[in-house]
Amino acid sequence: KSQIFSTYADNQPGVHIQVFEGERAMTKDCHLLGTFDLSAIPPAPRGVPQIEVTFDLDANGILNVSAEEKGTGKRNHITITNDKGRLSKDEIERMVNDASKYEQADKMQRDALEAKNGLENYAYSMKNTVSDTNVSGKLEESDRSALNLAIDTALEWLNSNQEASKEEYEHRQKELESTCNPIMTKMYQSMGGGAGGMPGGMPDMSGMGGGQGPAAGASSGPKVEEVD
């Protein structure tokens, strides 16, 4: 099984991979199996590097987890054996029971996290777009100021509201989109664009969905969490 992750900050030099075992939505409620780092990632804007994390569980129960930065081919991995910190049968049964017991609460947490990631991804994507000289130079000064103010306001709110509800994050994203979409559409139309989407490099104006943020979603296998 493979999954693509990315960086969380501009020019992030590496990622810290944490491998968890468990059925819960959040890694804090799961069992940490091991960690490893993937370093020397070339400087790039947040979300640009493509890091493929692959899980391989063999017939003997030995788990191999590898991470590869697709642009450079830089790789690292960890091997986790049955005798290295794995849960016992009783512990696994308890965690499965807990997952069933807290299923509704976990779903609310997971939905809120996905909405938070959606807002964060959209805001940073718009920030990168407005910072692009190819775009910035085509915006009217008043529009550029309005975009920067709306983006900065959304990011400041995010920093102060890390545990808001799904509805609050979705409301904030709609507010941001209500400022960004008309301005970007007007700019595109002034360049002679028609239907069929925005120019390359511009974010989807319909809003971005929940991204591959840390611990996004529950799964039946180990989880990967990235940090700065």
UniProtKB/Swiss-Prot annotation:
GO molecular-function term, one example from the UniProt record: ATP-dependent protein folding chaperone
Entry-linked Pfam families: HSP70
Keyword Secreted: no
InterPro entries to which the protein is assigned, alphabetical: HSP70_C_sf, HSP70_peptide-bd_sf, Hsp_70_fam
Region (Disordered): 191-228
Gly residues bias: start-end ranges: 191-200
SUPFAM superfamilies referenced in this protein's UniProt entry, alphabetically: Heat shock protein 70kD (HSP70), C-terminal subdomain (SSF100934), Heat shock protein 70kD (HSP70), peptide-binding domain (SSF100920)
Keywords of the record: ATP-binding, Nucleotide-binding, Stress response
Keyword Nucleotide-binding attached: yes
PANTHER family for this protein: HEAT SHOCK PROTEIN 70KDA (PTHR19375)
Similarity annotation: Belongs to the heat shock protein 70 family.
Record's protein name: Heat shock 70 kDa protein
Organism: Leishmania braziliensis
